[in-house]
Design a protein with these regions (language model features):
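Conserved alpha/beta-hydrolase catalytic His-Asp/Glu region
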Residues: 91-94, 109-170
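A short beta-to-alpha transition loop/helix N-cap that caps and shapes the active-site region
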Residues: 13, 38-40, 86-94, 125-126
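Gly/Ala-rich beta-loop-alpha elbow adjacent to hydrolase catalytic centers
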Residues: 59-63, 67
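Conserved HGGG/HGGXW glycine-rich cap/lid loop of the alpha/beta-hydrolase fold
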Residues: 1-46, 60
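Flexible "cap/lid" loop of the alpha/beta hydrolase fold
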Residues: 72-116, 121
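Short beta-strand/loop motif that positions the catalytic acidic residue
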Residues: 168-169, 175-178
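Active-site signature of alpha/beta-hydrolase-fold catalytic machinery across serine-
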Residues: 19, 69-73
Protein backbone atom coordinates (compact mmCIF):
# COMPACT_ATOMS: atom_id res chain seq x y z
CA UNK A 1 0.00 0.00 0.00
CA UNK A 2 1.18 3.47 -0.82
CA UNK A 3 1.99 5.66 2.19
CA UNK A 4 -0.05 8.81 2.77
CA UNK A 5 1.30 11.92 4.47
CA UNK A 6 -1.28 14.24 6.04
CA UNK A 7 -0.24 17.78 6.95
CA UNK A 8 -2.50 19.52 9.47
CA UNK A 9 -3.39 23.20 9.53
CA UNK A 10 -2.34 25.96 11.89
CA UNK A 11 -2.59 24.90 15.55
CA UNK A 12 -3.83 21.47 14.51
CA UNK A 13 -2.50 18.06 15.49
CA UNK A 14 -3.12 14.50 14.31
CA UNK A 15 -6.52 14.80 16.04
CA UNK A 16 -7.66 16.81 13.02
CA UNK A 17 -7.32 13.72 10.84
CA UNK A 18 -8.64 11.09 13.29
CA UNK A 19 -11.59 10.06 11.05
CA UNK A 20 -9.33 9.85 7.99
CA UNK A 21 -6.70 7.85 9.86
CA UNK A 22 -9.41 5.36 10.87
CA UNK A 23 -10.77 5.17 7.31
CA UNK A 24 -7.26 4.64 5.92
CA UNK A 25 -6.35 1.91 8.40
CA UNK A 26 -5.15 -0.34 5.56
CA UNK A 27 -2.63 2.29 4.43
CA UNK A 28 0.53 3.51 6.12
CA UNK A 29 -0.40 7.02 7.29
CA UNK A 30 2.10 9.59 8.53
CA UNK A 31 1.02 12.83 10.21
CA UNK A 32 3.58 15.48 9.40
CA UNK A 33 5.25 17.52 12.12
CA UNK A 34 4.83 21.17 11.16
CA UNK A 35 5.63 22.71 14.53
CA UNK A 36 9.42 22.88 14.72
CA UNK A 37 10.46 25.38 12.03
CA UNK A 38 9.61 28.98 11.18
CA UNK A 39 9.67 28.72 7.39
CA UNK A 40 7.51 26.71 5.02
CA UNK A 41 10.63 25.59 3.13
CA UNK A 42 12.24 24.24 6.33
CA UNK A 43 9.03 22.48 7.36
CA UNK A 44 8.82 20.85 3.91
CA UNK A 45 12.47 19.77 4.04
CA UNK A 46 11.96 18.26 7.48
CA UNK A 47 8.90 16.32 6.32
CA UNK A 48 10.76 15.07 3.25
CA UNK A 49 13.65 13.89 5.43
CA UNK A 50 11.24 11.70 7.42
CA UNK A 51 9.06 10.63 4.47
CA UNK A 52 9.15 7.43 2.47
CA UNK A 53 10.63 7.60 -1.03
CA UNK A 54 7.19 8.00 -2.68
CA UNK A 55 3.88 8.93 -1.11
CA UNK A 56 0.45 10.50 -1.52
CA UNK A 57 0.15 13.92 0.11
CA UNK A 58 -2.71 15.93 1.60
CA UNK A 59 -2.54 19.27 3.37
CA UNK A 60 -5.20 21.37 5.06
CA UNK A 61 -4.81 25.17 5.07
CA UNK A 62 -1.26 25.73 6.36
CA UNK A 63 -0.66 22.09 5.49
CA UNK A 64 -1.54 22.95 1.90
CA UNK A 65 1.13 25.66 1.84
CA UNK A 66 3.63 23.05 3.01
CA UNK A 67 2.35 20.48 0.50
CA UNK A 68 2.91 22.91 -2.38
CA UNK A 69 6.45 23.50 -1.11
CA UNK A 70 7.09 19.75 -0.89
CA UNK A 71 6.08 19.53 -4.55
CA UNK A 72 8.52 22.32 -5.40
CA UNK A 73 11.35 20.60 -3.54
CA UNK A 74 10.73 16.98 -4.56
CA UNK A 75 7.97 16.59 -7.16
CA UNK A 76 9.16 13.11 -8.14
CA UNK A 77 8.35 11.79 -4.65
CA UNK A 78 4.65 12.76 -4.62
CA UNK A 79 2.26 10.37 -6.38
CA UNK A 80 -0.95 12.32 -5.83
CA UNK A 81 -2.06 15.44 -4.01
CA UNK A 82 -5.02 16.83 -2.08
CA UNK A 83 -5.10 20.55 -1.27
CA UNK A 84 -7.82 21.22 1.30
CA UNK A 85 -9.07 24.69 2.27
CA UNK A 86 -5.80 26.31 1.28
CA UNK A 87 -4.53 29.00 -1.05
CA UNK A 88 -1.55 29.43 -3.36
CA UNK A 89 -1.53 33.18 -2.64
CA UNK A 90 0.71 34.85 -0.07
CA UNK A 91 -0.94 36.82 2.73
CA UNK A 92 -2.47 40.19 1.93
CA UNK A 93 -1.08 42.99 4.13
CA UNK A 94 -4.13 42.95 6.44
CA UNK A 95 -3.76 39.18 6.96
CA UNK A 96 -0.15 39.68 7.97
CA UNK A 97 -1.18 42.37 10.43
CA UNK A 98 -3.79 40.06 12.02
CA UNK A 99 -1.14 37.37 12.34
CA UNK A 100 1.28 39.81 14.01
CA UNK A 101 -1.42 40.76 16.56
CA UNK A 102 -1.96 37.08 17.39
CA UNK A 103 1.80 36.51 17.66
CA UNK A 104 1.99 39.45 20.06
CA UNK A 105 -0.75 37.91 22.21
CA UNK A 106 1.08 34.57 22.27
CA UNK A 107 4.41 36.17 23.12
CA UNK A 108 2.89 38.26 25.91
CA UNK A 109 1.51 35.25 27.79
CA UNK A 110 -2.04 35.50 26.41
CA UNK A 111 -1.91 32.50 24.08
CA UNK A 112 -5.06 31.05 25.67
CA UNK A 113 -7.05 33.79 23.90
CA UNK A 114 -5.70 32.88 20.46
CA UNK A 115 -7.77 29.74 19.69
CA UNK A 116 -10.95 31.53 20.79
CA UNK A 117 -10.16 34.43 18.44
CA UNK A 118 -9.35 32.09 15.55
CA UNK A 119 -12.26 29.68 16.02
CA UNK A 120 -14.92 31.65 14.08
CA UNK A 121 -12.67 31.68 11.01
CA UNK A 122 -11.88 27.97 11.24
CA UNK A 123 -15.38 26.50 11.17
CA UNK A 124 -18.57 26.98 9.22
CA UNK A 125 -21.03 29.46 10.75
CA UNK A 126 -23.47 26.60 11.37
CA UNK A 127 -20.91 25.01 13.75
CA UNK A 128 -19.97 28.08 15.80
CA UNK A 129 -22.08 26.91 18.76
CA UNK A 130 -20.82 23.31 18.57
CA UNK A 131 -19.08 23.08 21.95
CA UNK A 132 -17.68 19.63 21.20
CA UNK A 133 -15.97 20.88 18.06
CA UNK A 134 -14.77 24.02 19.81
CA UNK A 135 -13.26 21.94 22.58
CA UNK A 136 -11.34 19.79 20.05
CA UNK A 137 -9.98 22.91 18.32
CA UNK A 138 -8.90 24.43 21.64
CA UNK A 139 -7.30 21.17 22.82
CA UNK A 140 -5.28 20.93 19.59
CA UNK A 141 -4.13 24.53 20.08
CA UNK A 142 -3.10 23.86 23.67
CA UNK A 143 -1.19 20.76 22.56
CA UNK A 144 0.57 22.78 19.86
CA UNK A 145 1.49 25.58 22.28
CA UNK A 146 2.45 29.23 21.99
CA UNK A 147 6.03 28.78 20.78
CA UNK A 148 5.04 26.45 17.94
CA UNK A 149 2.16 28.80 17.08
CA UNK A 150 4.59 31.70 16.67
CA UNK A 151 6.83 29.56 14.44
CA UNK A 152 3.82 28.48 12.38
CA UNK A 153 2.55 32.03 11.93
CA UNK A 154 6.05 33.24 11.01
CA UNK A 155 6.29 30.47 8.41
CA UNK A 156 2.87 31.31 6.99
CA UNK A 157 3.67 35.02 6.71
CA UNK A 158 6.90 34.25 4.85
CA UNK A 159 5.46 31.69 2.44
CA UNK A 160 6.08 31.89 -1.28
CA UNK A 161 3.46 32.82 -3.83
CA UNK A 162 2.61 29.39 -5.26
CA UNK A 163 0.42 30.62 -8.12
CA UNK A 164 3.25 30.58 -10.71
CA UNK A 165 4.03 26.99 -9.69
CA UNK A 166 0.52 25.52 -9.99
CA UNK A 167 0.80 24.70 -13.70
CA UNK A 168 3.86 22.53 -12.94
CA UNK A 169 1.86 20.14 -10.74
CA UNK A 170 1.65 16.98 -12.81
CA UNK A 171 0.20 14.44 -10.37
CA UNK A 172 -3.51 13.72 -9.91
CA UNK A 173 -4.74 16.52 -7.66
CA UNK A 174 -7.89 17.18 -5.66
CA UNK A 175 -8.61 20.75 -4.61
CA UNK A 176 -11.37 20.90 -2.02
CA UNK A 177 -12.81 23.92 -0.23
CA UNK A 178 -15.91 24.10 1.86
Amino acid sequence: MEPIILIPGLLCTETLFAPQIAALADHPVMIANHRDHDSIAAIASSILAAAPERFALAGLSMGGYVAMEILRQAPQRVSRLALLDTSPKPDAPEQGERRRVLISLAESGKFSKVPHLLYPGLVDASRLDDEGLKSVVIEMAIETGAEAFVRQQTAIMGRADSRPFLAAISVPTLILVG
